[in-house]
Amino acid sequence: MNAIDLEGVEETGGIVAAPTTSLPESFGGSRNWDYRYCWLRDAALTLGALLEAGFTDEAMLWRDWLLRAVAGDPEDLQIMYGVDGARRLPEIELDHLPGYEGSLPVRVGNGAVSQLQHDVLGEVMDALSETREHDVDPDGFAWALQRALVGDLLEHWDQPDNGIWEIRGEPQQFTHSKAMVWVALDRAVRGVEEHGLEGDVERWREVRDQVRAEVLERGYDEERGTFVQHYGGTEVDASLLQLVAFGFIEGDDPRMLGTIRAIEEDLMRDGLVL
């Protein structure tokens, strides 16, 4: 837990992605980002790990931080916040600094804060559902938030987004993003069916099934026998492995087996996936 304690702030419950800024992805390169913020995706996955490991107090600190950070209009949901819940994180380049190993620019803030990333809602919905599954400190406001988030998602789930990789170019219809839309709706449906909570379950179930059918049709390349990074493409990426982890498809499904083989062939180097 020492690493988690280092990256978390006891006073707020927020968990930062990293305590550093502008460390380069490659020496001398320009992909030097500021990661001293709380990404909802990263923190949601951390919450699940904390619950599974039995660190319920730490998990509840983050859940409470989440509820405070995203309070208000669900349309204003951001993919990241400051550790204190700050929303304004403008990206600024500090030209007077030399950068680590000459890697420029040095950045403060992160421009991805304004991106649309559909998958984040899936991870948040799954994380809050996990707290319910573990029967840890149930909170009626968490469900009210989930209902509001899903209601907003229904209005724009079919729009292209920047995806889990935070692409700074043209938004795409990313397969992983759409699968995580399914996750968000599925967890909402479960809240009603398995826990007796109130919600528009018929509408949620209808759109959930619609999204899944679309992903299986448009996010899958019949000729190659794999899911693809985005609709109309042929490349695979590592995020597709999460389709199994979140229950979108079984790991032994032939479509997933083909995807795994392609990822191993195209993206694996020395046992690591790029």
Task: Show where each model-derived region lies.
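Acidic, mature catalytic/reactive cores of soluble proteins
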Residues: M1-L274
